[in-house]
């Protein structure tokens, strides 16, 4: 039996009495879990809920043996869309069984920030998660120099281009592109 912290990213009906969960875990990365669906089920298939999972490894996916809720991110209103955005990033970009405890921590902190009304904190945590994900994937651009080879200057604004990388922003902006 494998024990791990995990958050449900997505749930899909599998059979009448079972559900297939895409779970993002601290020790095993993104995995698929088959869980029984019943009134007495000891697991939660609610997204944005951190839980302590006991799993049994199978050939294709894991089987949920036991579950204890640890904490739920009570995300309301339009912030739910930001939570779905985080889940979609993980679903589409992370390969299965790619553990990264630091990324898991960034993910959970970003979800927790979405509970609060502080838009600045939410933006900061979303960007921190995106940066951590890019680093995990090996796709983070160099942020020490710009596309011209010049060192980054604190008083200038920059943007990230697909081909060029980090470039000086041609216009003066009232708010920085990267805080």
What is each stretch, according to the model?
Residues 1-18, 24-179:
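Non-catalytic alpha-helical scaffolds and adjoining flexible linkers that form interface surfaces
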């Amino acid at each position: 039996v494998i024990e791990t912290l995990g958050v449900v990213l997505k749930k899909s009906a599998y059979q009448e009495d079972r559900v297939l969960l895409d779970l993002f875990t601290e020790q095993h990365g993104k995995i698929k879990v088959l869980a029984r669906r019943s009134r007495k089920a000891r697991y939660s298939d609610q997204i944005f809920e951190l839980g302590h999972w006991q799993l049994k490894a199978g050939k294709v996916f894991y089987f949920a043996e036991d579950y204890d809720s640890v904490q739920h991110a009570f995300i309301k209103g339009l912030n739910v869309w930001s939570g779905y955005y985080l889940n979609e990033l993980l679903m589409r970009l992370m390969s299965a069984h790619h553990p990264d405890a630091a990324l898991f921590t960034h993910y959970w902190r970003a979800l927790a920030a979405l509970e609060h009304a502080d838009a600045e904190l939410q933006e900061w945590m979303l960007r921190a998660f995106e940066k951590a994900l890019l680093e995990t994937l090996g796709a983070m651009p160099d942020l020490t120099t710009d596309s011209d080879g010049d060192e980054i200057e604190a008083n200038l604004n920059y943007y990230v281009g697909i081909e060029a990388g980090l470039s000086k922003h041609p216009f003066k902006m009232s708010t920085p592109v990267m805080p």
